[in-house]
């Protein structure tokens, strides 16, 4: 399937594409597009898996333009760590993190990047958002 048709297909029918194997450049486009459906690249977790090794990481970049400003959204990294814990069989720890994360969002406490998109939410700094998640554990 060519890339433009694939991008349309995954956006219209994301549940039909739980696993995608493609070249790195194509998956970069697809991951950005699909991340938009769940809040953006700041919230979407990332994993690279093989039979021999797996890496769990935030989905994109280092954002040098916001370094040191305490405004980065740590959700992608937190959810990647949660996914890693589930993958290695530490399900209880995984559930604690995902439950605390979900509770924090339900309390309408989110980072600035998402608060700009959702009315009625409290915009928190990176560190305050992390503290709220920890408090909900």
Please name every model-derived segment.
Residues 100-137:
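Glycine-rich phosphate/pyrophosphate-binding loop and the adjoining helix
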Residues 1-8:
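Short acidic loop-to-helix transition motifs that present clustered carboxylates
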Residues 9-109:
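Glycine-rich phosphate/nucleotide-binding loop
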Residues 3, 70-72, 122:
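Active-site nucleophile and cofactor-binding loops and adjacent substrate-binding regions
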């Amino acid at each position: 399937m060519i890339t433009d048709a694939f991008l349309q297909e995954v956006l219209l029918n994301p549940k039909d594409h739980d696993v995608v194997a493609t070249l790195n450049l194509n998956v970069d486009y697809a991951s950005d597009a699909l991340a938009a459906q769940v809040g953006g690249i700041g919230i979407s977790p990332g994993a690279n898996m093989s039979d021999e090794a797996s890496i769990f990481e935030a989905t994109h970049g280092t954002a040098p333009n916001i370094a040191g400003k305490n405004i980065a959204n740590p959700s992608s990294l937190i959810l990647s760590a949660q996914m890693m814990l589930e993958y290695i069989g530490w399900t209880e720890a995984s559930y604690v993190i995902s439950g605390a994360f979900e509770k924090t969002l339900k309390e309408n406490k989110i980072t600035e990047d998402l608060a700009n998109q959702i009315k009625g939410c409290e915009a928190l700094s990176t560190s305050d958002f992390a503290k709220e998640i920890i408090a909900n554990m």
